[in-house]
Every structure is written in C-alpha cells, then in structure tokens.
Design a protein with these regions (language model features):
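Short, functionally important secondary-structure microenvironments
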Residues: 1-195
C-alpha cells in the first residue's frame, strides 16, 4: 500500500513547516522538568511524549489546511496506530505494569479503538489532558512541550510512587485492581479522531 508511505512523507515534511527545532534542541539541555530530575529514562520518555503530542499538533494543522491529504493520513494511522496487531496488544495483559514503557505504549496508541483507560492508573486523566479533539489549541512546539511536561508529571509521579513503595510488577493497588483511573477495565476506549 503506497498511501501510508505518502502519509508518512507528508507527516515528516510538515514538521519542517510547523515545528520549532530550536525548541527541541533546548529540551535536550534540560536537567529537570518541574520537580523531577531527568535521568536518561525520564529524558527519553519526555522526548517521546513531546514527539507524540507535536506529531498530533502538526497532523491537525495539515488536516485542517489540506483536506485532500486526509486519505493518506488515514492510511498512515491505520498502518501504525489503528492496526489489529496494536489492538491485540492493547487488549492483552501486556503493558499494564506501572512503568514508562507501558505508559508510552498506551499513550501513543490513544487513537486505537481498543484503548483501555483502565489499563494503568491515571491513563484517562492523561487522555483528557492531551485532549486530542481540541489539539488545535496548541499553537506552537512550545505549547506541545508544556503539555508534555504535564503528562510526564502525572506518569513520573505514578512510576516513582511504585518504585518508592517497592510494589511488585503490575500491582496497581493492594488487590491488583486499578483504583486510580476513571476508565473501565473492559476497554471503553473509543479511540480519538485524527480529524
């Protein structure tokens, strides 16, 4: 399928027009985000969240300004985010541990209909904070970075609290149930609109 390749080229090319690469460079020099010291893992997670949010911001600009490209973007999203393979991963018992890898997998796949907001604590809060349907409110790369800081603040607090309490893997509470998120454990994710 050629369409997703065109979609990927359009997506990457749109960063040249709409992303501020100086802002990305400044992020690389940070040693702290809000009250969190940045070790290598936190920095990589932070950069991943920035990339995800900036991608959605830029895609939103192109969607609104060039509706003729929508089909290519739909092919791109269907290939990488809305595939059955990703849906199977979201529905499985994988990526349910309170760690950075699990949060990243769940966040970057919010567009998939198999999204399960009950998979991790505060996942629904993160989804609402990103507010994909109103992504156009982000006017710049700096706005995407600030939103990413807020997302990371939630995730790092959750991950650090588990590390600090010495809880075992995949334990979200005393009885293994997720008490922190308002999402249902049976899925409940309708995905988010790309356009």
């Amino acid at each position: 399928n050629f369409d997703y390749v065109v979609g990927l080229a359009l997506h990457e090319g749109s960063h040249i027009a709409y992303s501020d690469f100086n802002a990305f460079a400044e992020v690389r020099n940070l040693s702290k985000v809000r009250e969190f010291d940045l070790d290598h893992q936190k920095m990589e997670f932070f950069r991943g969240v920035i990339n995800y949010i900036e991608d959605r911001r830029v895609d939103g600009i192109v969607f609104r300004g060039s509706p003729g490209y929508k089909g290519y973007y739909h092919s791109l999203y269907n290939k990488y985010f809305n595939s059955k393979k990703v849906a199977n991963g979201l529905s499985s018992e994988m990526y349910r541990e309170i760690d950075l890898e699990s949060y990243m997998f769940r966040i970057i796949n919010f567009t998939n209909e198999a999204t399960d907001f009950g998979a991790l604590p505060r996942l629904l809060d993160i989804y609402k904070l990103i507010n994909m349907k109103n992504i156009k409110r982000l006017k710049s790369t700096d706005d995407a970075i600030e939103l990413s800081k807020s997302v990371c603040e939630i995730v790092w607090s959750m991950v650090d609290s588990v590390k600090g309490n010495g809880e075992g893997d995949n334990e979200n509470s005393e009885n293994g149930e997720n008490k922190e998120s308002e999402g249902s454990s049976d899925g409940g994710g309708n995905g988010t609109e790309v356009d």
